Amino acid sequence: VSRGLGDVYKRQFLASYQFLKGLEKGTMDITREHLPNKSSITEIKIENFYLKEMPVLTQILSVASFTGALDILEGKGVFFKEAFLKYELVNDELRILECYGTGPSLGFVLEGKIRKDDFVSLNGSLAPANTINNIVREIPVVGKILTGKKGDGIFGASFKIKGKDNLKVEVNPIKTLTPRFIQRFLKILKK
């Protein structure tokens, strides 16, 4: 197991994936476990960072009509308290096992893969912070204390990112969040 991989590796990792462009500040911890057959499992935890001027996220936010988050992204950036990525590398194909991010403005979950030929195929869900508050609010006793007064229903956007050089983004802007998405966020928030 390789723990605390160095800054050079971290910069190379961020530079090698087009959809990660725009990550600023924060701290990153990377752990890699080498497995047989030239495969590995890597865990990346990033804390207290901003996403800024990220074309794929800009497109998702604008189609999903998350205008407040879009304004922040185009300004100082969208702040995330924590993001976690666990992936398996098998035959030079990156398979996402778990990926999420939480912050005061947005939360997301992501799954998919990046093939050996650099073709990206990702699916995810994006929720504004008030949606996350509504999820937390449903936790018996503690939820209402933590989130204050009740807001509107639980809605978010789902998206797909596909392609090689020019990533194509599809967004379903009015998607009721699935129980799986809600369960993942409750699990994340309980950590």
Labelled PLM ranges:
Residues 1-5, 9:
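Single conserved hydrophobic/aromatic residue that forms the stacking wall/gate
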Residues 2, 28-29:
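Short alpha-helical segments and helix-capping/turn motifs at coil-helix boundaries
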Residues 8, 58-61:
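Short secondary-structure boundary/capping segments
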Residues 17-23, 29-38, 42, 59-60, ...:
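Extended terminal
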Residues 47:
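Short edge-strand/loop segments of extracellular domains
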Residues 50-52, 132:
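Gram-negative outer-membrane beta-barrel proteins
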